[in-house]
């Protein structure tokens, strides 16, 4: 069904006097149904009123649009009435005349007596019959606001837009007016969108509270549903069991944003330095020899680094993901290609380490992994997850071991997810061993492990050597999951903003190059070189260029999505996906779930830096964030309720929720 | 093989054409079409809330490509045809069973 009002990917960008641009709102997406009451909360200057103005038609979005009943809103109209904080009454007219002005203009086709009746009804609705002939100067603040509401309602609008309507009123008047407003809304069934700073007010009045992050590039951070039944009363809502939990969540959100604002002041600097050349042209970037290191190889070999002024980029081949993490920590590496969860894990200090704030401005690849099992399972007839469960249950005294590359890798998280969805507890029914990717096959051959989940070429290698077969690829688990990301220390990005931007641009262009299948043969030859993956193209090619052979009865088939580098907005560092990773790390007890997850995700996953690079390249940077994620088992992850998602899993470890303050620790370090 | 049909804004044709040619596309068919989408094709309003459905002038581009090129073509199309405002159009992708080149009788991939 078409929503009543749809705010469709709205950006609002203001030009600055110095020729720059200030991105106030970024990618706002919201669907509102008829009769709903929505509150917008957020810190001052985050763009709440700008958003309201765009719904009213007083302002226009730079990109995207607001659609009401299937029509784009391009100008103000009487079906959308605004109530401002400062009343905006005409001082030389009486209460009645102020309202009559609106009615006579908008409803001029109605006969006079009917117009009169509407005016009287609305005055009665806000209880101002006695003051009908007073001028605004003779009224109290609360009365003036009631006149403004009556005026807004008198034209029978479909939408009432309230911009901090009760901001200037004393507590008592405010309380009374809130109750009146609720009654009026209930009677007229009008849809309301209200901007407010007051969390109690938002809870009392709204069906949903939309919380905006602090600008620049403000977006929807979280949406809270308010399940309190109507009619509500000011004194009774506090008794509802969810009231304080919701209130706490809102206050907590605002506090997180306050901290984020202080950090944001530093990253503003980044944009200012943009055009002045690069700060550092010699970079050491870490990578692991895997097929999906292709963007780094291409950026170097095809001159994308050079093109963007990065003249001496050294690609450092590392033995394991742990070595990459250490290299970043020890500052031996400027940055690295990382498994998707690693920047978050480093930021949170996973494994008892000091938190090290990291930044991910782009995803470098999606998909490209598979789960390979030893041939002995094939001989036992294991073809599906269910077969595997039965096989494992047959021999409870024998624990099988599977290899994975790093706790924060998608290989680990997807393998665990896959096992658990088939009722195999990855910590109890099976043993997981951590091994670097290039050592997987030799360990499988030696019998140290019975299978593994890893990126290519190691699955195809095992298949071609007739050591194992692929029971599932990640296309079967989560097609399009983020796989490798660019990970840089936040402190580094703040110090070398222009260099970082150049690096992201070079890698984005390299990613685009990698995804053109006409280039794949050439890339294959580069990857096979000893300084990169260093194996025969025969093993790298399946999935990347040619048919993917699972090593079972099934015929090898072309998997066009198997290595995604650019298409389908692969490079967007989605916050929702980052949050999914946090839920899984917490699910398996690697981390305490950060109570301040909004703050953590916003710090690490940086669509704003991604967008900046895209704009420099003239690419569209738009992609909906804050979207649901669902994997092969159909369970839906909504970014508004991460803890609820973890708890819905049958198999999970004990979940601890802790606030993780990355900055305070950061300051102690310096 | 897949057919990619894109409905775009008429003034975007040149940009789209250049982007597709650069992506290695060797042929396309363009036609003038009229239609409406979610917007019901217009932004005029008469007195309050009375609306009519109007058709808008658009261009339709049809391209037949190998399966492996579809994502790339779609991405190029989106990049080139996008203005960010409502009414940028849509892309439809459908399977193609067979292609025959009339002059030579060549089939499928050779015929594209």
UniProtKB/Swiss-Prot annotation, chain A:
Reaction(s) catalysed by this chain's protein: nitrate(out) + ATP + H2O = nitrate(in) + ADP + phosphate + H(+)
All copies of domain ABC transporter, residue ranges: 5-239
Region (Linker): 255-278
Gene Ontology CC annotation, any one: plasma membrane
Keywords annotated in UniProt: ATP-binding, Cell inner membrane, Cell membrane, Ion transport, Membrane, Nitrate assimilation, Nucleotide-binding, Translocase, Transport
Superkingdom of origin: Bacteria
Membrane topology field: Peripheral membrane protein
Annotated residues for binding of ATP: 42-49
Subcellular location: Cell inner membrane
Biological-process GO terms, alphabetical: nitrate assimilation
Alphabetized GO MF terms: ABC-type nitrate transporter activity; ATP binding; ATP hydrolysis activity
Subunit structure: The complex is composed of two ATP-binding proteins (NrtC and NrtD), two transmembrane proteins (NrtB) and a solute-binding protein (NrtA).
Protein name stated in the entry: Nitrate import ATP-binding protein NrtC
Organism of provenance: Synechocystis sp. (strain ATCC 27184 / PCC 6803 / Kazusa)
The encoding gene: nrtC
Swiss-Prot record, chain B:
GO CC terms in record: cytosol
Keywords: Nucleotide-binding, Phosphoprotein, Transcription, Transcription regulation
InterPro entries (alphabetical): N-reg_PII, N-reg_PII-like_a/b, N-reg_PII/ATP_PRibTrfase_C, N-reg_PII_CS, N-reg_PII_urydylation_site
Any one biological process term the GO annotation gives: regulation of nitrogen utilization
Modified residues annotated as Phosphoserine in this record: 49
Molecular functions (GO terms): ATP binding; enzyme regulator activity
Keyword Transcription regulation assigned: yes
PTM entry text: Phosphorylation dependent on the nitrogen source and spectral light quality.
In-chain residues carrying the UniProt-annotated modification O-UMP-tyrosine: 51
Keyword Iron-sulfur carried by entry: no
The protein's assembly and partners: Homotrimer.
Cited function: P-II indirectly controls the transcription of the GS gene (glnA). P-II prevents NR-II-catalyzed conversion of NR-I to NR-I-phosphate, the transcriptional activator of glnA. When P-II is phosphorylated, these events are reversed. In nitrogen-limiting conditions, when the ratio of Gln to 2-ketoglutarate decreases, P-II is phosphorylated which allows the deadenylation of glutamine synthetase (GS), thus activating the enzyme.
Family membership noted in the UniProt record: Belongs to the P(II) protein family.
Protein name as annotated: Nitrogen regulatory protein P-II
């Amino acid at each position: 069904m078409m929503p009543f009002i749809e705010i469709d990917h709205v950006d609002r960008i203001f030009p600055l006097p110095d020729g720059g641009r200030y991105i106030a709102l970024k990618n706002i997406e919201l669907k509102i149904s008829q009769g709903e009451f929505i509150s917008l909360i957020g810190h001052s200057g985050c763009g709440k009123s700008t958003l309201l103005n765009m719904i009213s038609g007083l302002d226009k979005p730079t990109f995207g649009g607001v659609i009401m009943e299937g029509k784009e809103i391009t100008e103000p109209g009487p079906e959308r009435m605004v109530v401002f904080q400062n009343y905006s009454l005409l001082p030389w007219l009486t209460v009645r005349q102020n309202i009559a002005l609106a009615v006579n203009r908008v409803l001029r086709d109605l006969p006079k007596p009917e117009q009169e009746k509407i005016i009287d009804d609305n005055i009665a609705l806000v209880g101002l019959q006695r003051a009908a002939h007073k001028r605004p100067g003779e009224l109290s603040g609360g009365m003036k606001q009631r006149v403004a509401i009556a005026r807004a309602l008198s034209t029978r609008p479909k939408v009432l837009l309230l911009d901090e309507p009760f901001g200037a009123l004393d507590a008592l008047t405010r309380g009374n007016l809130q109750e009146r407003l609720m009654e009026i809304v209930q009677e007229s069934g009008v849809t309301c969108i209200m901007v407010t700073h007051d969390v109690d007010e938002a809870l009392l009045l709204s069906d949903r509270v939309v919380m905006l992050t602090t600008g620049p590039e403000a977006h929807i951070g979280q949406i809270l549903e308010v399940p309190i039944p109507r009619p509500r009363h000011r004194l009774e809502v506090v008794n509802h069991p969810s009231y304080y939990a919701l209130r706490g969540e809102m206050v907590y959100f605002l506090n997180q944003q306050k901290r984020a604002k202080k950090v944001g002041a530093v990253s503003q600097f980044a944009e200012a330095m943009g055009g002045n050349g690069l700060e550092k042209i010699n970079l050491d970037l870490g990578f692991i020899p895997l097929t999906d290191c292709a963007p780094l190889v291409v950026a170097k070999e095809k001159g994308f680094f050079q093109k963007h002024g990065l003249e001496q980029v050294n690609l450092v081949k590392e033995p394991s993901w742990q070595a990459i993490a250490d290299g970043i920590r020890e500052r031996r590496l400027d940055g690295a290609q990382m498994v998707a969860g690693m920047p978050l894990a480093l930021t949170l200090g996973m494994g008892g380490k000091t938190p090290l704030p990291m930044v991910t401005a782009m995803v470098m690849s999606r998909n490209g992994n598979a789960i390979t099992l030893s041939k002995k399972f094939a001989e036992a007839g294991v073809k599906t997850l269910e077969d595997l469960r039965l096989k494992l249950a047959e021999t409870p005294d024998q624990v099988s071991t599977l290899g994975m590359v790093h706790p924060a890798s998608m290989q680990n998280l997807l393998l665990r997810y896959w096992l658990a969805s088939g009722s195999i507890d990855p910590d109890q029914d099976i043993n997981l061993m951590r091994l670097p990717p290039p050592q997987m096959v030799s360990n499988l051959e030696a019998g140290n492990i019975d299978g593994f989940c890893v990126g290519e070429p190691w699955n195809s290698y095992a298949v071609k050597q007739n050591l194992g077969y692929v029971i599932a690829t990640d296309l079967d688990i989560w097609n399009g999951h983020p796989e490798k990301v660019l990970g840089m220390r936040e402190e580094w990005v703040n110090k070398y903003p222009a260099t970082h931007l150049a690096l992201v641009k070079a890698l984005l262009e390299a990613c685009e190059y990698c995804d053109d299948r006409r280039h794949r043969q050439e890339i294959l030859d580069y990857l096979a070189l000893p300084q990169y993956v260093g194996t025969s193209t025969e093993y790298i090619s399946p999935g990347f260029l040619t048919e993917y052979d699972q090593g079972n009865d099934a015929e090898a088939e072309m998997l066009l999505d198997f290595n995604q580098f650019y298409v389908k907005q692969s490079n967007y560092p989605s916050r929702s996906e980052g949050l999914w990773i946090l839920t899984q790390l917490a699910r398996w007890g690697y981390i305490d779930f950060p109570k301040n997850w909004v703050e953590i995700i916003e710090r690490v996953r940086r669509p704003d830096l991604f967008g900046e690079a895209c704009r420099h390249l003239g690419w569209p940077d738009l992609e909906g964030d804050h979207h649901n994620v669902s994997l092969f088992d159909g369970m839906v992850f909504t970014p508004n309720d991460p803890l609820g998602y973890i708890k819905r899993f049958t198999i999970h470890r004990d979940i601890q929720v802790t606030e993780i303050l990355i900055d305070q620790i950061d300051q102690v370090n310096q | 093989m897949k057919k990619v049909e894109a409905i775009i804004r008429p003034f975007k044709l040149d940009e789209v054409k250049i982007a597709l040619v650069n992506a290695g596309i060797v042929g396309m068919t363009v036609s003038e079409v009229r239609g409406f989408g979610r917007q019901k094709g217009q932004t005029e309003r008469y007195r309050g809330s009375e609306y009519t459905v109007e058709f808008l002038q658009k261009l339709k581009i049809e391209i037949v490509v190998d399966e492996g090129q579809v994502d790339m073509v779609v991405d190029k199309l989106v990049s080139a045809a996008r203005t960010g405002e409502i009414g940028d159009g849509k892309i439809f992708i459908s399977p193609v069973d067979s292609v025959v080149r009339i002059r030579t009788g060549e089939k499928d991939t050779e015929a594209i």
